[in-house]
Amino acid sequence: MALKIRLRQQGRRNHVVYRLVLADVESPRDGRYIELLGWYDPHSTVNYQLKSDRIFHWLNQGAELTEKAAILIKQGAPGVYCELMAKRMARKAAVCQKRRAYRQRRSLKRAEAKQSVVN
């Protein structure tokens, strides 16, 4: 079951309000959700309210963000977003380091093989 943090549309015709929810990928846009993580009202002066601790929890559990939800979280809970990006960058750096070490070992083996063929 893949999970996404996304916006769920609420409200009336000319006054749309969104809820930030954790939902299964296969559920419809305005359908069933697992947990309410906040809300966003584009028409109000107080635009949004987010539960940053719960968002952080679900992101650590492997939930993915949609583009619009990421923008909203970046504005409303910048600490959560920065920590998420730091973890992603650390993970990428670790993968790059493993690949670099593998390439180095492979080139050394090839050089040794060439050397043994020459001798």
UniProtKB/Swiss-Prot annotation:
This is Small ribosomal subunit protein bS16. One of its GO terms (molecular function) is structural constituent of ribosome. GO terms for biological process: translation. NCBIfam families: PRK14522.1, S16. Keywords: Ribonucleoprotein, Ribosomal protein. Belongs to the bacterial ribosomal protein bS16 family. One of its GO terms (cellular component) is cytoplasm. It holds the Pfam family Ribosomal_S16. It comes from the Bacteria.
